[in-house]
Amino acid sequence: MGSRRAKGRRPGGYAKTPTVFQMEATECGAACLCMVLGYFGKDIPLEQMRIETGVSRDGSKAGNLMRAGKRFGLEVHGYKKGVEGLLKLPVPCILHWNFNHFVVWEGVKGKDYYINDPAMGRRKLTLEDIDSCFTGVVLCFAPAEGFTTSRKENRLSAMVAARLKGEKASVFSLMIMGIFLIVPGLVIPVFSQVFIDDILIGGNSDWMTGLLFAMIITVIYKAGFMYYRGILLLRLQNKLTLLSGYRFLFHLFRLPISFFSQRYAGDLSQRVDNNNNVSIFLTSDLAQTLLNIFVAAFYLILMFIYSPLLSAIGIFLVLLGLFVMKNTAKAISDLSMKVQMDQGKYIGGMMAGLTMTDTLKASGSENEFIGRLQGYYAKCGISEQKLGFRQEAMKAIPEVSASLIGIIVLLVGGIQVINGNMTAGMLTAFTALLTSFTQPVSELAGFIRNIQTAKADLSRVDDIMRYREDGRFEENGREDMTEKLIGDIRLENISFGYSILSEPLISGFSFDLPCGSSIAFVGASGSGKSTMSRICSGLFQPWEGEILFDGVPLQRRPREVLSSSVSTVSQNISLFSGTIRDNLTMWNKYIPDNDIVEACKDACIHDLITNKPGAYDYVLAEGGANLSGGQRQRLEIARALVTNPSVLIMDEATSALDPIIEKKIIDNIKRRGCTCIIVAHRLSAIRDCDEIIVMDKGKIVQRGTHEELKEQPGHYQRLIQTM
């Protein structure tokens, strides 16, 4: 496919590319390259393309897209063009858009200009729109010699197999129910034929009572089995929802911190619903449809026994309707994905606003925020409206098809009765069978509509389930030990960055920190201090070099030992609605009360807690809203101390405290004898550290004690003047 398209490519024209939606704002370039490769016949998962294009918290660069395209076997050329020059380039190509986005240029069709936007889907634009948004940077692609195509695996089939694994008994029971339900569907049309031909026309009134009794028994039989089948489906649905929900959340919370830093919390919470929707689709839509098709096959056999001609007419019209529905399905799939993305942005924006109400009110920005939120909501409404139009059109197809089938069958069947090829009872029975056959087939319209939504749900779930877990959860090669760490830390030639295709942010970083000593990272904003603290805690994995705890590489230490030995106090305070005890212990019931009290005393928060109603069982509001900023920060410090850590990492942990309280807490921490890594802008927090490392653009520019550094001209002298 790729080679044929390569030969037929010429300047201008139109190329319809497959739509790949970005899951986060920073991966538009990766999604665009997936679309271009998909057009040439090579389907690459978005999660793989993220890595290949070096997507970081700052997105991806055009140069990264070019290098990735070449690795996948494409010829890539970058140009600087105006709109007139763009119209002469072969399509598809990738455009830099609005100086902060990438889109796929599909070209011109008639009088319309098309782009495929990974954030919004396919868009029809005017030349003025393109001129105002196109920055002039364009990347052109063509299959190189040796380019190979690859088909995307059927994720829906794989998902069905994975989720129904171990449910053979339930599926078998449902199939048995389907077989039993075939009987009344086949018998009732026969009863209709007997009633018309033998009782009404034939005059055998003696048969009336027996036939009526048999029909009542059949209806009761059908109702009983339908009820039992519904119970089985409900049980299977609940079981699948619980199991898949557990697996989803289990995997979600084992993902690296970088995953969460690039996504809205509201969007992630919506994906829990997406995961549940997939399970509901399996049991309510897929299972029901498979049973309907199974039953329809038996109706079809009996229909051919009655009249092959009428059966052939009915099948032809049904297949025609299915063909039309299939051609509508792809558009519904893309629109469903767009709706879910817009809903995720809206919910994420709403949640962000609810967590920053103080800031909004203090700055008087309520109207601006509401306007921004209304923009998200309007996008949701527009997307839902477009999807609704398509879905309503698809709903109409089976209704029109069923009416057309009924009219034609009645017309042709009437001729057959007049010619003596059928009796009136046979035509009535056939019509009943045809209705029973077309009803489940007509329900395929709803199924096709729902399967497109399920594919969109699955894409958003797969974005999480295919993401590689945090390396800290890998158990291979870890030592078998249960004792806490002593607290010796050594970093040897550490390099790290947020994009594998860019220069490292941290490079050549080394230090040796003996047990019980302290070190501070200082520097201007963006110098890499917080990044370095996260590397020390194991949240970020270095590209090069080693982190040694007590002389053993960090990756060989059991995760449980690291969690109990290393505590971190972040500059972002995280408190949830619950008791103070739960906030301190994170629901760990094995932490003794004495350790909780001692930690709170060292954090200078114990007296405040005991004065609250219920003391340690006092319920905090969401985010600790019923505490002051300094109180929340002290509670965060106490949380880090309850496990009696050997290593304490503090990132701006005392920024909201007054100097007297700050000094008391630092003295209490030193008395504990734990190794300390401190990131701070305040001189009082770092002046007594055993070593101070001054950072600039990820590199060490000065190091030494406070007394040594304050005498040396350079960064540190300038920093302490502003502290």
Predicted region positions:
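Hydrophobic alpha-helical transmembrane segments of ABC transporter permease domains
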Residues: 184, 196, 205, 273-317, ...
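Juxtamembrane loop-to-helix connectors within ABC transporter transmembrane domains
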Residues: 192-193, 253-298, 355, 361, ...
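Transmembrane helices of ABC transporter permease
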Residues: 213-222, 226, 288-337, 409-422, ...
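Cytosolic ends of transmembrane helices, especially the final helix of ABC transmembrane type-1 domains
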Residues: 342, 346, 358-365, 389, ...
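ABC-family ATPase nucleotide-binding domain "signature/switch" substructure
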Residues: 531-534, 564-572, 580-583, 599-603, ...
